[in-house]
Curated annotation (Swiss-Prot):
Protein name per its UniProtKB record: 4-hydroxy-3-methylbut-2-enyl diphosphate reductase
Entry GO MF terms: 4 iron, 4 sulfur cluster binding; 4-hydroxy-3-methylbut-2-enyl diphosphate reductase activity; metal ion binding
Matching Gene3D superfamilies: 3.40.50.11270, 4-hydroxy-3-methylbut-2-enyl diphosphate reductase, catalytic domain (3.40.1010.20)
Role according to the record: Catalyzes the conversion of 1-hydroxy-2-methyl-2-(E)-butenyl 4-diphosphate (HMBPP) into a mixture of isopentenyl diphosphate (IPP) and dimethylallyl diphosphate (DMAPP). Acts in the terminal step of the DOXP/MEP pathway for isoprenoid precursor biosynthesis.
Stated family: Belongs to the IspH family.
Entry keyword set: 4Fe-4S, Iron, Iron-sulfur, Isoprene biosynthesis, Metal-binding, Oxidoreductase
Principal EC category: oxidoreductase
Chain residues that bind [4Fe-4S] cluster: 12, 96, 197
Annotated PANTHER family: 4-HYDROXY-3-METHYLBUT-2-ENYL DIPHOSPHATE REDUCTASE (PTHR30426:SF0)
Cofactor comment text: Binds 1 [4Fe-4S] cluster per subunit.
Species annotation: Aliivibrio fischeri (strain ATCC 700601 / ES114) (Vibrio fischeri)
Length: 314
């Protein structure tokens, strides 16, 4: 049974930066370091940071006074930022710069009283943070997930409308929603550049290229990882039986029975160390040669905040 590795896969620049921020904070300041929400949606990563002294909370009221808090890569609302400032908490912001770009689009629209439609999944922390960038009382912000949601929209001024999207969505499904928005609201404006992040796009393209070459697809990622779920869904849509797993123990031998080629990819928050562990488990179930496909080269890099680049704490 041949093992075929997608390329690119795994960590993106935003995830690398977010994890580095927590690691540097733990190095420069005494534990505990508080992190609002899982810094990235990967159980393996979160457990490793917990062991080093990071404490993950869902709300700021769980952070004691006079402490450090890190905002996760998914971003936070303006209300959360305001609360942190009012409590004089020391904040390090691990929001992915590509999410910040979307936040800035919403904030600009809000200042101009332009209504905004966000394409995204209800309840996802990135969506909650992006919705929380809209401050205008004279216009509104709306969330849609599907083309059917667009038809139900009742905006105040169809001629004064802008759309943005969650960065980790399915490229194809987002395109369908955008097409419907433009059909229903011909004057709607969008971002100059697609909001879907480069890593999401690249990993979906890699799965699209690989799906027809394998009998079964293993996607390494946590159940709460949006981009990992989209990889599994895309592979299934392309006709390949696919599974999302969090660790080697999740892999079932019967999934691989009588298969000749198994594909392996990983969401943007899954580390290569975990991918390697799962490859070893596939080998234990009969995997032999490993072939890594060629793919789009990624050289994006996001720096950590300047305060965390210093060598010592003054």
């Amino acid at each position: 049974m041949k093992i075929v590795l997608a390329n690119p896969r795994g960590f993106c620049a935003g995830v690398d930066r977010a994890i580095s921020i927590v690691e540097r904070a733990l190095e420069l300041y005494e534990a505990p370091i508080y992190v609002r929400h899982e810094v990235v949606h990967n159980r393996f990563v979160v457990e490793g940071l917990k062991q080093r002294g990071a404490i993950f909370v869902e709300e700021l009221h769980e952070v004691p006074d006079d402490n450090i808090v890190i905002f996760s890569a998914h971003g936070v609302s303006q209300a959360v930022r305001k609360e942190a400032k009012e409590r004089a908490l020391t904040v390090f912001d691990a929001t992915c710069p590509l999410v910040t770009k979307v936040h800035m689009e919403v904030a600009r629209a809000s200042k101009k009283n332009i209504e905004v439609v966000l394409i995204g999944h209800a309840g996802h922390p990135e969506v909650e943070g992006t919705m929380g960038q809209y401050a205008s009382d004279s216009a509104g912000m709306y969330l849609v997930e599907t083309p059917d949601d667009v038809i139900k929209l009742n905006v105040k001024d169809p001629s004064n409308l802008h759309y943005v999207s969650q960065t980790t969505l399915s490229v194809d499904e987002t395109a369908d929603v955008i097409d419907e928005l433009r059909r229903v609201f011909p004057e709607i404006q969008g971002p100059r550049k697609d909001d879907i992040c480069y890593a999401t796009q690249n990993r979906q393209d890699a799965v699209r290229d690989m799906a027809s070459q394998v009998d079964v697809m293993i996607v390494v990622g946590s159940k709460n990882s949006s981009n990992s779920n989209r990889l599994r869904e895309l592979s299934e849509k392309l006709g390949t039986t696919s599974y999302l797993i969090d660790c080697p123990e999740d892999l079932k031998e019967e999934w691989l029975t009588e298969q000749t080629k198994v594909g392996v990819t990983a969401g943007a928050s899954a580390p290569e160390e975990l991918v390697n562990q799962i490859i070893e488990q596939v080998k234990a179930f009969g995997g032999t040669a490993v072939e890594e496909l060629t793919g789009r080269e990624e050289n994006m890099f996001f720096e950590v905040p300047k305060e965390l680049q210093i060598k010592t704490v003054s």
